[in-house]
Regions:
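N-terminal leader/signal peptides at the extreme start of proteins
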Residues: 1-7
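Conserved functional hotspots that engage anionic ligands or polymers and/or phospholipid headgroups
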Residues: 10-13, 17, 27-31, 36-51, ...
Length: 148
């Protein structure tokens, strides 16, 4: 073969190499964006459940609770279409534990807790939140006291 017929072969190889490298970079970026999208969706579901639990907790503290329904052995719940709040007497004297539930797409609900003091003498009582009593974990010492 003559030298004239082989001109441009190395240029073609360089262009093909650049195209392959560009395709590999685009593929890697696509995978990275897919994982970032999944992470953003998970965060969105968590924040929705967290806000729902916080709203339920705030709503629950503002409710009147029947004195004869609350005990240390089990939760008594009130709910609306979107919110669910539960209360029980704490193992600590003079404390009512209020729980707000937020629905996750699968698995356990997200739960927030508030330590409160009961006010009132009739068949129901109002609750007043304890300063520093907001918790994202159940404060009871025994695990059975936190279970439904």
């Amino acid at each position: 073969m003559s030298a004239v017929g082989q001109r441009g072969g190395s240029t073609l190889a360089a262009v093909m190499l650049l195209l392959v490298m560009g395709l590999m970079l685009l593929n890697a970026q696509h995978r990275q964006l897919d994982s970032a999208l999944l992470l953003a969706a998970d965060q969105q579901r968590y924040l929705k459940a967290y806000n729902q639990a916080a709203s339920a907790l705030s709503w629950g503290v503002a409710q009147s609770w029947p004195r004869n329904r609350l005990g240390v052995n089990g939760w008594w719940c009130q709910q609306t279409e979107e919110l669910r709040a539960c209360a029980k007497l704490s193992a600590r004297a003079g404390i009512v534990l209020v729980r707000g539930d937020g629905a996750m797409s699968e698995g356990e609900p997200l739960r927030l807790y508030q330590l409160t003091k009961p006010d009132g003498t009739g068949g129901t009582f109002e609750l007043s939140a304890e300063v520093g009593g907001w918790l994202d974990f159940c404060p009871e010492k025994r695990e059975a006291d936190c279970a439904d």
